[in-house]
């Protein structure tokens, strides 16, 4: 449910307008002028709210909902209570999101936290930096020498943009973010607390001189339409660049090592760790807490199950999971086999009488 203290209240919409906008079918045409003033989940919705249903796990919430209208697929249409206006849709959640995007367009990218429309008095902008028109710089942000920032971009409070960094148009850099040695395209959304372009973890280990640091002289290249979640860190390359491909969406607290190349339209969930010199193809999806070893190649369209550890190359369109990761069919067979062994093993297996004289180490 939208909280007016934080988000703008959208204007009322009629069910006819909602149906026209989403391509949904309003089953009871007599309710076409019924007004909707907000969006909410099934369990929190009231008579003026629009909701959706697309998962049978929430059937009890659907039966008890007080919502005024609900997007629902034909399969579940008969389960909708009589007081709820039915908006039939083949993709209920997608239709709901369409309306949510229209009603709350301002939430799709961070805005100035201070309702600022220009360069704040307390911001520090080096004289050699070039900011195009309509760039917003919030209080206490620092823009270094030679920086270039395109029109419509917003730099959050306390962000630090290092020397020579280039940021394209209509970008958002969240509060407390640091960016160095990086070139960033257009329409890039960087959430608060990210760190981009710092040294990669490059050392010659355990030599006679100790751990010898390897110079990191590459860059970070972030292409257009990338989104980077809060607290994510992206190391610059050592010799070649670290690259994030166009349209890729990265969740919070992801670590991307030096020289990593991520293709276009990839999805990376939270707390992933990518070791250095790894290559990921286009349209790859990685679940939360996946770890991938260095110098591997993950093929186009591959998917990796959450909490997997990857030590081998994955072919295009591979579906892998486990620790260590392997094709999911093989992984599932092994899991079921171990489960059968545990279930069907000797009744007393593992229950030997302890030696009373054994006091441990």
UniProtKB/Swiss-Prot annotation:
Keywords: Acyltransferase, Lipid A biosynthesis, Lipid biosynthesis, Lipid metabolism, Repeat, Transferase. It is an enzyme of class 2 (transferase). The keyword Acyltransferase applies. Disulfide bonds: none annotated. It catalyses: a UDP-3-O-[(3R)-3-hydroxyacyl]-alpha-D-glucosamine + a (3R)-hydroxyacyl-[ACP] = a UDP-2-N,3-O-bis[(3R)-3-hydroxyacyl]-alpha-D-glucosamine + holo-[ACP] + H(+). The active site is at 258 (proton acceptor). Pathway: Bacterial outer membrane biogenesis; LPS lipid A biosynthesis. One of its GO terms (cellular component) is membrane. One of its GO terms (biological process) is lipid A biosynthetic process. One of its GO terms (molecular function) is N-acyltransferase activity. PROSITE patterns: HEXAPEP_TRANSFERASES. Its EC number is 2.3.1.191. Pfam families: Hexapep, Hexapep_2, LpxD. Belongs to the transferase hexapeptide repeat family. LpxD subfamily. Homotrimer. HAMAP family: LpxD (MF_00523). Catalyzes the N-acylation of UDP-3-O-acylglucosamine using 3-hydroxyacyl-ACP as the acyl donor. Is involved in the biosynthesis of lipid A, a phosphorylated glycolipid that anchors the lipopolysaccharide to the outer membrane of the cell. This is UDP-3-O-acylglucosamine N-acyltransferase. It comes from Nitrobacter hamburgensis (strain DSM 10229 / NCIMB 13809 / X14).
